[in-house]
Amino acid sequence: RVLFRSDLSWADSVGSRQMPGNHVILSANSFGAVADSTVLSTEAIQKAIDSCAVSGGGTVVLQPGYYQTGALFIKSGVNLQLDKGVTLLASPSIHHYPEFRSRIAGIEMTWPAAVINIVNEKNASVSGEGTLDCRGKVFWDKYWEMRKEYEAKGLRWIVDYDCKRVRGILIERSSD
């Protein structure tokens, strides 16, 4: 039984080929992000990302702590750096994830955004030794409850599309 393959030559052909340039380093904390797991910091972190993109690209950082967030959209030329000690906690509210057209299980449909999204962007990245805690239990509990109801009606597979759940990371139609 092989637990780890030492041949990782394939790794060179996946992922970001280059990191965004570090023209600017912005702290999302200076935009109002609060290292308090009970405070929603989505707007502040997104403002830092957007400002970094408008400045020509660079890196967005956070001070160590726990940050509750909804959907974040990484822009071209921006690196969201989650250093050790930084934890992004996904909001348990589906309302913090705007819906848009995406591909789910091979089908184009409207679906909630992920916690971290890179869509139609170039040279965007997420790096660091920090943590993304998607806290998906609330969404999966809903799914399993709905699945019981659907199975009783012979509609097992429909629940997969009716019970919208937040994804952790979405990278779609992006390059470098």
Where are these regions (language model features)?
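Extracellular/periplasmic carbohydrate-active domains that bind, remodel
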Residues: 4-176
